[in-house]
Amino acid sequence: MPKRVLQGVVVSDKTDKTVVVRVERRFTHPLLKKTVRRSKKYHAHDEANAWKVGDTVWIEEHRPISKLKNWIVIQGEKRAEV
């Protein structure tokens, strides 16, 4: 069975070897017929502490690493410096 891969934005990197990633999904509301945005936060393993707040990353489902971490960061893009 293939592992799920999600794309999101890092919203916290304060924990050692862990990032919190916000994944957004969009759907059409069945009654209102308008696009609705919903997001969910996932704790993901970041072995090298490479990703910072604002970076776009892809996370992959993984075996449980801790109580909250079931995802690992597989790749990403650094946020552009201004």
From Swiss-Prot:
Cystines in this chain: none
Single GO molecular function: rRNA binding
Gene Ontology cellular component annotations, sorted alphabetically: cytosolic small ribosomal subunit
A GO biological-process term: translation
Keyword line: Ribonucleoprotein, Ribosomal protein, RNA-binding, rRNA-binding
Family affiliation: Belongs to the universal ribosomal protein uS17 family.
Assembly notes: Part of the 30S ribosomal subunit.
Task performed by this protein: One of the primary rRNA binding proteins, it binds specifically to the 5'-end of 16S ribosomal RNA.
Protein name: Small ribosomal subunit protein uS17
Source organism per UniProt: Xanthobacter autotrophicus (strain ATCC BAA-1158 / Py2)
